[in-house]
């Protein structure tokens, strides 16, 4: 159930077609989880600053049941910062990603939970 959320001040008009699909496929490969369970939410046009500057930036979160930890998170950071830099022109040093290892009982889906 990985869920990747990107809040950014990049305008909607600068979000390329296919970005959400690309993030879905890349996260499926990186996490080893089926693409059918991956959710991606990009929220453009946000009023944001990073280091006191309104240059392009992003505040992100990746939630997953398992597959979250030190070495894995470094791999995800490299992948996701690279994609956001390439596709949205956000410098990797202007991106924060918070990682959340979710308890399966606390994640609802399809009328139940993953527990």
Swiss-Prot record:
Q: Could you say which enzyme class this protein belongs to?
A: isomerase
According to UniProt, the reaction catalysed is: 3-phenylpyruvate = enol-phenylpyruvate; L-dopachrome = 5,6-dihydroxyindole-2-carboxylate
Catalytic residues?
A: 2
PROSITE patterns per UniProt: MIF (PS01158)
Q: What is its EC number?
A: 5.3.2.1, 5.3.3.12
The chain residues annotated with the modification N6-succinyllysine are 78
Entry's Gene Ontology BP terms: inflammatory response; innate immune response
Q: Where in the cell is it found?
A: Secreted; Cytoplasm
* InterPro entries the record matches: Macrophage_inhib_fac (IPR001398), Macrophage_inhib_fac_CS (IPR019829), Tautomerase/MIF_sf (IPR014347)
Q: Which residues carry the post-translational modification N6-acetyllysine, per the record?
A: 78
Q: Which GO terms describe its cellular component?
A: cytoplasm; extracellular space
Q: Which UniProt keywords apply?
A: Acetylation, Cytokine, Cytoplasm, Immunity, Inflammatory response, Innate immunity, Isomerase, Secreted
Q: Where does substrate bind?
A: 33, 65, 98
Q: Which GO terms describe its molecular function?
A: cytokine activity; dopachrome isomerase activity; phenylpyruvate tautomerase activity
Function, as annotated: Pro-inflammatory cytokine involved in the innate immune response to bacterial pathogens. The expression of MIF at sites of inflammation suggests a role as mediator in regulating the function of macrophages in host defense. Counteracts the anti-inflammatory activity of glucocorticoids. Has phenylpyruvate tautomerase and dopachrome tautomerase activity (in vitro), but the physiological substrate is not known. It is not clear whether the tautomerase activity has any physiological relevance, and whether it is important for cytokine activity.
Q: How does it assemble?
A: Homotrimer. Interacts with CXCR2 extracellular domain. Interacts with the CD74 extracellular domain, USO1, COPS5 and BNIPL.
Q: Which family does it belong to?
A: Belongs to the MIF family.
What name goes with this protein? Macrophage migration inhibitory factor
